[in-house]
A protein has these predicted regions:
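Conserved coil-to-alpha-helix start sites within the AMP-binding
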Residues: 76-81
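A general structural signal for well-ordered alpha-helical segments in protein cores
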Residues: 11-12, 29, 33, 105
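ATP-dependent adenylate-forming carboxylate-activation enzymes
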Residues: 95-106
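N-terminal "arm"/small-domain region of PLP-dependent enzymes with the aminotransferase-like
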Residues: 1-23, 27
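Short N-terminal helix/helix-N-cap motif within the alpha/beta-hydrolase-1
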Residues: 56, 74-75
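Phosphate-binding glycine-rich loop
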Residues: 22-69, 83-87, 92-95
Length: 106
């Protein structure tokens, strides 16, 4: 593994946020969301704490839930199936191609 490449400016910003008492939903997060929305030419953007949270929110936005099946590769991280169960849907595991780990239609 590699050590993170952080500038002093980045370290100072993290210290500023930690000292503010707001870690996840404070003014810096709101500023970041507004800048991301502006850059993406959209009205709103939402920061989430993890890829797992993002994937679950995506399923919910798409209306995936009870009675739905979601196809996922068998070779994956556990959260892939967990979030599908969490929204009430059923994960359907499919084989992966040897060497590439892409889903294989067989």
């Amino acid at each position: 593994m590699l050590r993170p490449d952080l500038s002093q400016a980045e370290i100072d910003e993290v210290i500023k946020v930690l000292k503010s008492g707001w870690i996840t939903t404070g003014p810096e997060t709101k500023l970041f969301e507004s800048r991301i929305a502006e850059r993406c030419h959209t009205e709103k953007a939402v920061c989430l704490s993890s890829q797992t949270s993002c994937a679950e929110l995506t399923l919910r936005i798409l209306g995936i839930g009870p009675g739905d099946e979601v196809i996922v590769p068998a070779y994956t991280y556990t959260a892939t199936a967990s979030i599908i169960y969490h929204v009430g849907a059923k994960p359907v595991m499919v084989d992966c191609k040897s060497g590439s780990f892409e889903m294989d239609a067989l």
